[in-house]
Every structure is written in structure tokens, then in C-alpha cells.
UniProtKB/Swiss-Prot annotation:
GO terms for molecular function: crossover junction DNA endonuclease activity; DNA binding; magnesium ion binding. The active site is at 15, 75, 147. The keyword DNA-binding applies. Keywords: Cytoplasm, DNA damage, DNA recombination, DNA repair, DNA-binding, Endonuclease, Hydrolase, Magnesium, Metal-binding, Nuclease. It comes from Caulobacter sp. (strain K31). It catalyses: Endonucleolytic cleavage at a junction such as a reciprocal single-stranded crossover between two homologous DNA duplexes (Holliday junction). This is Crossover junction endodeoxyribonuclease RuvC. The lineage of its organism: Bacteria, Pseudomonadati, Pseudomonadota, Alphaproteobacteria, Caulobacterales. It is found in: Cytoplasm. Binds 2 Mg(2+) ion per subunit.
Length: 169
């Protein structure tokens, strides 16, 4: 039982990246989950760093305005061997956290490993396995890119864990 009150809610999942930020929106009513929309925000790779972050922020704000989610969930940063890349990814995550917070949404964060375990059943799942499970869980989503599948997986994880977390609290 995902939504005990049976009041439909929309959840925005975000897979932040400086080159491509995937987003996905799901609707949850009771134990039923359905696909609303998904896409990718792609800043100009040749643009200045600050302009690329602004593009991500404004793109996420536009998604929020268009799809009116009630809550948001963002994938946490994984550590890279390149510290500079990890730092830049952290900036992209900041944009992904601030945009929904600015809109007044509850924002949750989940590790990549937890998202994989929640959707596929193992924290070591690869991109193909995530894509396969997204197609099974949200058949109306159609074919998704890896970024979109990851974002939808984050939204699904939040949908499943939000009720469990409330039961514990």
C-alpha cells in the first residue's frame, strides 16, 4: 500500500548531471502507480559553467510548473575517481535540490545503490536492468533513455519508501 489515503500524489524524480539531467514524474494513488511524463534537460556543453547550471535550474523549474508534482526525489552523488568531476556533479545536484525546494516541495535524497535495490532488487544492477524494470513497472512510459529511466527509478523508490518511512516515524 503506497498511498494509504488514496489521494493521488505526483512525484518528480531527478537524476542530476551537468551534461544531461533526467527527470520523470509518476502519479501514485493507493497501490497504483502510473507514468505521467519524463524527459532530459541538456545544457549547451560549450556554455559557461554558471550558464549550464542556470539551464538545469530553469529546466527543472519548468518541469515543476508543467507537471505540478507534490514531492521530489533526487539521486545522491556517487564518488568519482576524478575529484573535479565529483565537485561539478555536486553543483548540478544543488540545482536539482534547490528548484523543487524553492517550489515548496518536500525533497528526498536516495543513494544510487538504494534506488537500484528498490527497483531491480540488487544494488549492483546495471543500466539495462533498470530500463527493463521501468518498462515493466511503467509500461506507458515507452522507451526511455538511461537518464530518464534512472529519474523514474528515483521517483518509484520515493513512492515506495515514503509510506514505509512514515510508518516508522
Amino acid at each position: 500500500m503506497m498511498n494509504a489515503n488514496r489521494i493521488p500524489i505526483r512525484i518528480l524524480g531527478l537524476d542530476p548531471g551537468l551534461r544531461r539531467t533526467g527527470w520523470g514524474v509518476v502519479s501514485v494513488e493507493g497501490s497504483r502507480m502510473s507514468h505521467v511524463a519524463h524527459g532530459v534537460i541538456v545544457p549547451d556543453e560549450k556554455g559557461e559553467f554558471a550558464s549550464r547550471l542556470l539551464c538545469l535550474f530553469e529546466g527543472i523549474c519548468a518541469v515543476i510548473d508543467a507537471h505540478r508534482p507534490d514531492e521530489a526525489a533526487v539521486e545522491e552523488v556517487f564518488l568519482n575517481t576524478n575529484a573535479q568531476s565529483t565537485l561539478k556533479l555536486g553543483h548540478a545536484r544543488a540545482a536539482a535540490l534547490i528548484a523543487p525546494a524553492r517550489a515548496g516541495l518536500l525533497v528526498a535524497e536516495y543513494s544510487t545503490r538504494l534506488v537500484k535495490k528498490a527497483v531491480v532488487g540488487t544494488g549492483a544492477a546495471d543500466k539495462a536492468q533498470i530500463g527493463f524494470m521501468i518498462a515493466r513497472l511503467l509500461p506507458t512510459a515507452g522507451k526511455t533513455t538511461a537518464d530518464c529511466a534512472d529519474a523514474l527509478a528515483v521517483a518509484i523508490t520515493h513512492a515506495n519508501l515514503r509510506i514505509a518511512n512514515r510508518r516508522v516515524a
